[in-house]
Amino acid sequence: MKNTFRAQCQCGQLAVSFTQAPVAQLVCHCRDCQTVSGLPYAKAAFFRAEEQCSEGEFLAVDMTGGSGKPKQYRRCRQCNDFVYATVDALTGLLGVAADKLLPPFEFKPMAHVWTCEKAPETEIPSGVFQFPKAPPFRPGKQ
């Protein structure tokens, strides 16, 4: 039996599930992620979009990413909790708020991205890959 990875909002109305493990896990320091999460950075797990099963109604927050391409953050219509995002620069992937993923998921970031917009008080552990903007690779591509 395959593991199922499920993320949901606080009230449980908005959820997304996947039957495959994430293809990448990143900590994003971009201003948009700071604004949407209300934190100095966002922990994101990227899953293949075609493997998703979503339920519930969401409110869309449309923005333009650093690539100049659109991205859409999706929040629960009832509790306003951010759960996942689509990013046109990462076609075919969904970025899921790692803190919304239920056990047995364990967040293990590959890298910190958009560190040029990092909050001054945020420290990045030594030995971790860091990129001032987007990583030079596309998550999920070999």
Regions found by a protein language model. Give the residues of each.
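A short Gly-Trp-Pro
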Residues: 1-8, 13-142
